[in-house]
From Swiss-Prot:
Localization, UniProt: Cell membrane
Keyword Zinc-finger part of the UniProt annotation: no
TM region positions: 20-42, 47-69, 104-126, 136-155, 167-189, 239-256, 277-299, 304-326, 333-355
Broad class of where this protein is predominantly found: membrane
Pfam families, alphabetized: Cons_hypoth698 (PF03601)
Organism name: Photorhabdus laumondii subsp. laumondii (strain DSM 15139 / CIP 105565 / TT01)
Gene Ontology terms: cellular component: plasma membrane
Family stated for the protein in its record: Belongs to the UPF0324 family.
Keyword terms of this UniProt record: Cell membrane, Membrane, Transmembrane, Transmembrane helix
Membrane topology: Multi-pass membrane protein
Name the UniProt record assigns to this protein: UPF0324 membrane protein plu2856
Length: 360
């Protein structure tokens, strides 16, 4: 596009909200295509749900024509990926009730706690002793893998005072393996359903998905590709894990401040802590929905809006997932994230089955 068009667009974009429109339109187009394709029998039989198709379409466009559109669409895509995702998760509470949350119970809580702590400590141990990575990179990758992906990395960044380059590396590794997992998890579930290797029901697989996948959106995509029950349980399990971000950041901040004091590097200002308020509101909405105060028609409309928001967020996530991110991340961070990814799947499966056997 010419400089004249770019300047003209820049002037028009001075109007509040105008800069969001091109990106929102692009995300909406991907959403419409994905919803249509998601109802095609072939995709249904392949276990490719609407959200999975949205991120796949986003990746294809993101690595082909999107670089040309990015100057015009970037702000709207960023808005979709961050704010529509959180709004979608908040509205997801209208699909749930406290009774369903109680059904996950102590088992889901213990599994989430075990996965978070084990994954983070493995990241610290391997990252420092085996790969010799710096503490900031290790903590960022560990937080992203053990809690909630890019959101956890962005929340951890001010605590460790990491530069933008290290944040980008950590986010790249999380997005790469989280995206791969979107396709592996439904495939593994279908194989296990056929061969009956492990005693996994739709509910227990939902807990496994929520306790091991990186991003909230990825959890929704995997659960959606299997069944409504799996999706509901997976999101509940994941949101319990996301809620653990706040105490994790508090403990991490205290640890870093203690280490800095021990090493003679006192900070004059307290490290800011980011609390995932969208997770708190999600729980509040689920509680409100438990009382059945709204007519069913309104709740169904909110659920439809929620589906559109989440699909737009997944498309936006795909648009910003670039193949070049693998090269930018480097070998050691990628290898660390790969090992953590394998642990989340294999170790997570063992922890899930073990705790469910003891407390289920």
């Amino acid at each position: 596009m010419s400089d004249i068009h770019a300047k003209k667009f820049s002037k028009q974009s001075s109007i509040p909200g105008m800069k969001l429109i091109p990106g929102l339109i692009l995300a909406a187009i991907l959403t419409a295509i994905s919803i249509y394709a998601g109802n095609i029998p072939w995709f249904i039989n392949m276990g490719l749900g609407t959200l999975t198709l949205a991120i796949l379409a986003g990746i294809i466009v993101g690595n082909t024509v999107y670089p040309l559109l990015k100057p015009y669409c970037d702000e709207g895509i960023h808005f979709s990926k961050h704010y529509l995702l959180r709004a979608g998760i908040i509205l997801y509470g209208f699909r749930l009730t406290f009774q369903q949350i109680a059904d996950v119970g102590i088992t889901g809580l213990l599994i989430d706690a075990a996965m978070l702590s084990s994954t983070f400590f493995i990241a610290i141990w391997l990252g420092k002793s085996l790969f010799g990575l710096d503490q900031q990179t290790v903590i960022l990758i560990g937080a992203g893998s053990s809690i909630c992906g890019a959101a956890a990395i962005m929340a951890t960044e001010p605590v460790v005072n990491a530069p933008a380059s290290k944040v980008a590396v950590a986010v790249s590794t999380i997005v790469i393996f989280g995206t791969i997992a979107i396709f592996i998890y439904p495939w593994f579930y279908q194989l296990n359903e056929h061969y009956q290797w492990l005693p996994l029901t739709q509910e227990t697989f939902g807990i496994f998905t929520g306790s091991t996948l990186h991003e909230v959106a990825q959890v929704v995509a995997v659960g959606h590709a299997i069944s409504d029950q799996t999706e509901n349980v997976a999101v509940i399990s994941k949101m319990i894990r996301v809620m653990m971000l706040a105490p994790f950041l508090l403990l991490l901040s205290r640890y870093i401040n203690h280490a800095d004091t021990k090493n003679g590097r006192n900070h004059q200002e307290k490290t800011p802590i980011t609390i995932p308020w969208f997770a708190v509101i999600f729980i509040a909405i689920a509680g409100f929905n438990s009382f059945n105060l709204l007519p069913a028609a309104i709740v169904n409309s909110l659920i439809n809006i929620d589906t559109i928001m989440l699909t737009m967020a997944m498309g936006a996530l795909g648009l910003t997932t670039h193949v070049s991110a693998i090269r930018q991340a480097g070998f050691k961070p990628i290898l660390l994230a790969l090992i953590l990814f394998v642990w989340l799947m294999a170790g997570g499966l063992l922890i899930n089955l073990g705790i469910q056997h003891l407390f289920g």
